[in-house]
From Swiss-Prot:
The species this protein was found in: Francisella philomiragia subsp. philomiragia (strain ATCC 25017 / CCUG 19701 / FSC 153 / O#319-036)
Catalytic activity as recorded in UniProt: uridine(38/39/40) in tRNA = pseudouridine(38/39/40) in tRNA
InterPro entries in UniProt: PsdUridine_synth_cat_dom_sf (IPR020103), PsdUridine_synth_TruA (IPR001406), PsdUridine_synth_TruA_a/b_dom (IPR020097), PsdUridine_synth_TruA_C (IPR020095), TruA/RsuA/RluB/E/F_N (IPR020094)
Database matches in HAMAP family: TruA
Name the UniProt record assigns to this protein: tRNA pseudouridine synthase A
Highest taxon of the lineage: Bacteria
Residues at which substrate binds: 110
Function, as annotated: Formation of pseudouridine at positions 38, 39 and 40 in the anticodon stem and loop of transfer RNAs.
Class of enzymatic activity (EC top level): isomerase
GO annotation terms (biological process): tRNA pseudouridine synthesis
Oligomeric and partner information: Homodimer.
């Protein structure tokens, strides 16, 4: 039995998220279906980070076990031929049998893309959040400092979050302006349900100068979801990287746009 690692990219619009659901198509379902056909046996996959409905990935990492006699090229080319256009395998390699794409990971990286322009773009509409008002990035980055470290993120978790603990460790949270794009990059050991999109909703209020950077500190201390702003839309969020003890994968979204 061999253990295979896949690096995959997907456009999340037409899917109910990563996880298999009975009522709607999912990334997991499509990938397992294609792999199972190539292997001629049932294949189950594990991913580094389960994304929600409408969220995209440029560098999701998946692993699966199989004893099917296939070389790496056959796995990749055959599976890609069966996958829908919105999901593709970028790379494949064999890894140790004890490797688990979820539990072996040490941290995960997400990007949230904001198109900050007076006029919206029809082409970019499904790929990033449009904000026509000018954002104060300096103040947004001042607020980001309060998100760093290991702390209780109750104020930024959804009511449907199933995690046993609200504590997470955020190693990086930063906005970078690249032309008309504003890219939020956040790195953490793991994330709560809707956590990043809830960050964005509140940080936008600061960028629009409705709140001060210090307001984020008060929201965190309240440990109350109702004290934070509304959840930002899903289509601006991308899973872009994951780090393991021996290797890492990362493809920033802006590299695809520029």
């Amino acid at each position: 039995m061999k253990n295979y690692l896949l690096q995959i990219e997907y456009f999340g619009k037409n899917y109910c998220g990563w996880q298999r659901q009975s009522h709607s198509p999912s990334i997991q379902e499509e990938l397992e279906k294609a792999l199972s056909k190539i292997a001629n046996q049932n294949i189950e996959v594990t991913c580094a980070g389960r994304t929600d409905t409408g969220v995209h990935a440029t560098s999701q990492v998946v692993n699966f076990h199989s004893d099917a006699d296939r070389n790496l090229s056959s796995w990749m080319r055959g599976t890609n031929a069966l996958l829908p256009q919105g999901i593709k395998i970028l790379d494949i390699k064999e890894v140790d049998n004890d490797f688990n794409s979820r539990f072996t990971a040490t941290n995960r990286t997400y990007n949230y893309i904001i198109y900050n322009s007076a006029i919206s773009s029809p082409i970019l509409a499904e790929h990033c959040l449009w904000e026509n008002r000018q954002l104060n990035i300096d103040k947004m980055n001042q607020a980001c400092k309060y998100l760093l470290g290991e702390q209780d993120f109750t104020s930024f978790r959804s009511s449907q979050c199933q995690s046993n603990t609200p504590f997470r460790n955020i190693q990086k949270a930063e906005f970078i302006k690249q032309g008309s794009f504003i890219v939020f990059e956040v790195v953490g050991n793991a994330f709560l349900h809707h956590m990043i999109r809830n960050f964005i909703g509140s940080l936008l209020k600061i960028g629009l100068e409705f709140e001060s950077p210090e307001w984020i500190k008060l929201v965190l201390e309240a440990k109350d979801r109702t004290k934070a702003a509304e959840t930002a839309k899903a289509h601006g969020l991308y899973f872009v990287g994951v780090e393991y003890p021996e290797f890492s994968f990362r493809r920033r979204v802006i590299e695809l746009f520029c």
